[in-house]
Amino acid sequence: MTEHETQMGLKPRFLVVMGVSGTGKTTVATGLATRLGWHFQEGDALHPPANVEKMSTGQPLTDADRAPWLALCHDWLREQVKAGHGAVLTCSALKRSYREQLRGDDLPIEFVHIDTSTGELADRLQRREGHFMPASLLPSQLATLEVPGDDEPVIRVSGEKHPDVVLEELIRHFQAED
């Protein structure tokens, strides 16, 4: 356990902060990692260069495009579980099959699904700078999204709230479960 986990009375968790582009995955995930002393991985950084190029030219990814990326995300999660310390990964995890691939080998992964209105997402993506994914791909991501079912290990949070509020809600949730 990290010092932060011990101070807060939390056991290590292995989280995938998920949702379409613009939900605030990175903000929430880095906030959790910082507050709790967990390891963090930006899932976008694991994309093969061909995927980044494809998205940056406005082309949506296919399942075949995503497969090697999801494998790298899974491998990172598996290493974190093996090490036994808390970890947070950002990953859109749009389809149930993607989430199942991330949880392969029976990894104890939990998903934090950030749900944000289409209007808010569009506004955020129009204002966002320095990211390879253009706002024009939002409709494709929304069409691909399979909202996690009640039978999946998911915590739902609102992306409409301030990130600090979301962080506090998540930490309270973890404390209540531990």
From Swiss-Prot:
* Keyword Transferase set for record: yes
Swiss-Prot/TrEMBL keywords: ATP-binding, Gluconate utilization, Kinase, Nucleotide-binding, Transferase
The residues that the entry says bind ATP are G19, V20, S21, G22, T23, G24, K25, T26
For this record, the Gene Ontology CC terms, alphabetical, are: cytoplasm
Q: Which EC number(s) does the record attach to this protein?
A: 2.7.1.12
GO BP: D-gluconate metabolic process
Please give the activity regulation comment for this entry: Activated by magnesium.
Organism superkingdom: Bacteria
Q: In which pathway does it act?
A: Carbohydrate acid metabolism; D-gluconate degradation
Q: Where are the transmembrane segments?
A: none
For this chain, one GO molecular function annotation is: gluconokinase activity
- Top EC class for this record: transferase
Catalytic reaction(s) noted: D-gluconate + ATP = 6-phospho-D-gluconate + ADP + H(+)
Which PANTHER family does the annotation name? Answer: GLUCONOKINASE-RELATED (PTHR43442:SF3)
The record's subunit annotation is:
Monomer.
What family is this protein classified in? Belongs to the gluconokinase GntK/GntV family.
Q: What does this protein do?
A: Phosphorylates gluconate to 6-phosphogluconate.
Name of the protein described by the UniProt record? Gluconokinase
User: What is the protein's species of origin?
Assistant: Gluconobacter oxydans (strain 621H) (Gluconobacter suboxydans)
